[in-house]
Design a protein with these regions (language model features):
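Short, low-structural-confidence N-terminal segments
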Residues: 1-79, 83, 343-344, 348-383
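Charged, solvent-exposed helices and adjacent loops that form client-binding or oligomerization surfaces
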Residues: 43-81, 100-183, 215-219, 266-273
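N-terminal accessory alpha/beta regions
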Residues: 92, 96-98, 102
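Surface-exposed patches in mature extracellular/periplasmic domains of secreted proteins
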Residues: 103-111, 240-247, 289-291, 349
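Peptidyl-prolyl cis-trans isomerase
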Residues: 226-274, 314
């Protein structure tokens, strides 16, 4: 269960850093943690700025213009960036503080694993196992972020955040969610569905070896539609989806099961809008067919909604699934809880040091030709 793309916090990296950014009575953040957070906030703000009519990738003037974030808040970009960086830093301190108050003990093996993961990201990147070596130290080290600070603001923070979440909402927690409430949420918000996609085109390769899609003839399309509509009728009469798939595999001469089944919150699903709408309209135990796309990219779908009530014991009984349901139910509330604690946190801010780091530090001009040049490429010693 991940709560942020890169958010870590283990032992605060103070011993290797001469400068600090924020601190409480018993905790201190290295300036590198602030720089990392400022960079993360910059990237997010830039994505909002790109929606502006007069956004210019060759200039950093957008930093002095108002942007609108995902919550609809409008603010001058550079101020938004600094505020978000500060908010992130205070969240790091809050999580550490609350772990102590909740008496949460994270095993050393778990912390070591998180640190090791950060080291991997730092040295070879998160996609090295897939053949893409992109060391994250190249992105951060030049700005003054050390491995310690990077780890503090990424994998360790995720580890601690998740541990605190479980301590608060798990069994025996200060805000424990009962099995009854979790089950109620599951039944009301989750959907158990399956669908079978059938391409209305064939794929071939030309003489150069390039793949090319060719739309089926009207006769071929009607054959597919008739077959899937027949399955739909069988399901609507109480038939089994497993039987439908077995029949389709036999008729198509394929041993591969191309159907997809999921139990999830439909609104948060990554499936297409058309599928979401079709599944959302279905009654339990019913099926429907629909066509998505056109020409040489069209797909015909058979969609089916199962009875979510039959999944309670088997789904929530699985520890990993239960954690996922709990996260879906309480993650937004927990985020606001942490934000609220951050607003009440007693801390010191090392303003004279923090003010040395401006949002434009991260600006990279992108010319119309897509050639990039860095405008503020001065390297700094790692913090």
């Amino acid at each position: 269960m991940m709560f942020s793309v890169f958010a870590i916090a283990g032992c605060t990296p103070t011993t290797l850093n001469k400068e600090w950014s924020y601190k409480t009575s018993d905790n201190e953040l290295a300036i590198g943690a602030y720089i990392y957070s400022l960079n993360a906030a910059y990237s997010q703000a830039e994505s909002f700025a790109k929606k502006l009519d007069d956004y210019d990738s060759t200039s950093d003037k957008w930093l002095d213009e108002k942007i609108k974030d995902d919550d609809g808040n409008e603010q001058v970009a550079r101020e938004w960036i600094k505020d978000q960086a500060k908010k992130m830093c205070l969240s790091y301190l809050v999580v550490d503080e609350q772990l102590k108050k909740e008496n949460v003990n994270i095993g050393q093996a778990t912390l070591d694993s998180a640190t090791s993961q950060a080291e991997t990201y730092w040295n070879v990147g998160p996609y090295a196992s897939q053949g893409y070596v992109m060391p994250m130290k190249k992105q951060y080290e030049k700005y003054g972020v050390s491995l310690d600070s990077f780890a503090y603001c990424t994998t360790l923070y995720n580890t601690k955040y998740e541990a605190l979440f479980k301590a608060v909402y798990g069994k025996g927690g200060s805000k424990e969610v009962s099995d009854a409430d979790l089950t109620k949420y599951f039944k009301e918000n989750y959907t158990d569905y399956s669908y079978l996609p059938v391409n209305l085109y064939t794929s071939t390769k030309d003489e150069a070896g390039s793949s090319k899609n060719v739309a089926m003839s009207d006769k071929e399309i009607k054959k597919v539609e008739d077959q899937l509509n027949g399955y739909k009728n069988d399901l609507n009469k109480g038939g089994s989806f497993d039987d439908v798939i077995a029949s389709y595999k036999k008729s198509s001469g394929s041993e591969k099961d191309s159907s997809v089944s999921n139990v999830e919150v439909l609104d948060k699903s990554s499936i297409g809008k058309e599928l979401k709408e079709a599944i959302g309209k279905l009654k339990t135990g019913k099926a429907e067919t629909l066509k998505v796309g056109s020409g040489d990219s069209a797909i015909y779908y058979l969609v089916y909604k199962k009875d979510i009530n039959k999944d309670v014991d088997s789904y929530i009984g699985n520890e990993s699934n239960r954690a996922g349901v709990l996260a879906s139910m309480k993650s937004d509330e927990f985020s606001k809880y942490i934000d609220g604690l951050a607003e009440k946190l007693k801390y010191e801010e090392n303003t004279s040091v923090i003010d040395k780091y401006k949002p434009e530090l991260f600006f990279v001009a992108v010319e119309p030709t897509t050639a990039a040049s860095t405008t503020t490429a001065s390297d700094k010693s790692s913090k």
